[in-house]
């Protein structure tokens, strides 16, 4: 280095003597000097990274902050790295608190990393407050907003599929659709939806939220966490906290993505020639005349005709800033999604704004607002594309019309393109949502906090539908043109408004006693909740002569024939008044106690004397790892044993006033001369003065543990829930009025497990996580012995004591009759006259005959097990995330190809039909007149198990040192693939099939769940 400096001195002296003034040469010299100076300042820094016990940390990361330059420690915890004095070194290790140190004049930098206390002291939102997760005795899953962002989902809940134990999420491929969520099974015959709480306000859905505006999401599943929500907590609670500013400089974030959606799993149907082969055989079996195929020689794939590759985009911008006294957040989003059926489109505009003001050291006020405008898609069905024959052409070019289907189909099925093209955009709908709160918070007497919050949510939905005149080409009619349906236009219209108003008044006391041995947080509160809905419906048809114009500006019920007008309305309101209390206590940080109480009064039961009900929970925990006898176990960081018990409530019933029934239309009477018709009315259902809430008794026991410097986390829990006093409607007998009573009990029980491993080896970081849930659902009692609730289009779903809710009911198939001798040797079938080739039903009750009494449970739609896997890998600026999920042990009932006297296209599996002795023992003969083959049986049951690569995301984050030159704080680009591949067993588009509480898991031609490919960019400045 001394020689280099001497050479530099001689060069300068030489230049001065020659007095060279050339600008280019001086520039070159300056560059040389700068380069030499930088070279002179670069040096090697060494050191050792250890833990608090002075043990070396192997594979700890040592990174030059703001760059991708770095190294890792060796087997002795030692490292060596080239740096400059201005550099800052960042030291990190999984489960440890990171440190940053400026190099300066140091040549040796030894670092001791401490255990990350945040791993043990994670704070979660629990409703009416927050708490350290280690102090809680229940099961709460925290989802960070980052896990929801950058995903092509209109509803943030869709992205949680497979990521949370105990939570089953069923997604639909329809544009803008909401997922179905069941937490720890189906708890009631009256509903399964959890309670959503958005910034403190109780809600029924969160489709108006932008995923980019969510800070965190907590999913509460256990009685210890849920009892404080009383009558609303029975089906679980999902708490959403939207983003607020953090103290620091003003930042602007822009996140935009775009991509496309594609149907990748089509239903396997026969082609044109195969259809003719099977249909000819069917006509022969039915002893019908052969069909004349003249003009019917197409080979149409109707699925290809109706489906499209759809466009999707999400765009968001947010501005955030904070000072010690004031913080604000403003986020605006725009989303647009096309459906995979042509002409379907959904769009949403959202706004999220919050302001918080710290007026004094003890007084804080603020507000939160969420708004949305949604234009729902005019969704179409895929059913006709599955049923229409492939021999029919799509379009007749000579007439310029779509083609009617052949005689054997057109009475039941339209050309699928009629709905897709000729009835496209005939429904116009707009949904508006405004939700928000204002609050004030006062700290006083050192340990007390009082918070008052007023919240309101207003939803306004309106829609109009137009029925056009549809003409098609039909060679079978004179003139070649026929009109579908009534041949008259029609309009219908609805308007619906819903209001929710809530007020909360909470007093919280927090203190520690006896040198921190006793730690207490106590909360008491008073809340009110009001909910009302008003809806008007109307319709008019075309009058004599005048056609209602095909113009959205004319689609109102003021147009059309007044004599054809129909109308209807719905209106109800409901209110709840509550007091609540909760205690979170620990002794010496290792003996935990949680207790909560809530007393609810509901207007729904105000005429019964049972309007008030108490709910409570008790929970205990033991942090064994804090005991002295556990301290020497170096690999154990945390071990907690926990258990809780509680009671919850449910008032969900589709009747607005279950205790005070409304009137409904009844028989009319004629009196007088001239005769006058007097309409009659009757009670919709009999009042029950003893009607009361549904009550859930729940308990769970489990453990949580962190091992190996908090790199490994594992938790497991056993849970059990009994819903008693089920609100059930008892049908009237022989035309009498039905009644409502508390007449049943449902039980759900199972096991939840979740495990995560995180580690970092130098520039490489990785994480692996998995979760698994088992569930057993059983109806313990219902009304009376032998009573069943029957649901579903094919009356295939039964709810009955001793069986799972919504189980599939029908005959078990023992094969296919191969011959008359086979029929004679089998139990006598009293249901119908059978022939060889018909389905052979099992004699379940063993009486020697096939009768309706042989029907039994043939499938359970509730999965026995659901599971999920996640893999994350980071290398320098690159990150890769893969989410997988699946379920098993459930069945699907296929209904879309099961109707008497209707001729549909054939599933590909029907090529293996019975057509002679020994040809098949699984597929019956082709004959729609043999109705026995259409009876509900396990011939229509399919395996609902599946495994799916749910999400794959690859991202690159640019070095801050590089992007700072263009004044950016952060820049990330990413690609995302959703629903990359599904391995399934059923014949339909998707094994994900939702439904109602008592009829789900039924494939009635369900909409496909597409693969979604997107590219995005996220930048902050």
PLM region spans:
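Short, small/polar-rich motifs associated with maturation and membrane association
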Residues: 1-352, 357-372, 404, 435-436, ...
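Extracellular/periplasmic, surface-exposed regions of secreted and cell-surface proteins
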Residues: 148, 152, 174, 193, ...
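C-terminal extracellular loops and terminal segments
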Residues: 157-161, 740-747, 787-808, 853, ...
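Aromatic-residue-lined binding/catalytic grooves and analogous aromatic/hydrophobic interfacial grooves
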Residues: 202, 869, 1019
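Conserved small-residue
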Residues: 253-297, 537-541, 741-744, 758-861
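Acidic, glycine-rich flexible loop segments
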Residues: 285-296, 312-314, 383-420
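Extracytoplasmic gating/loop element in the C-terminal half of outer-membrane beta-barrel translocons
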Residues: 290-291, 303, 472-475, 602, ...
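Glycine-rich, aromatic-lined ligand/substrate-binding cores of catalytic
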Residues: 861-893
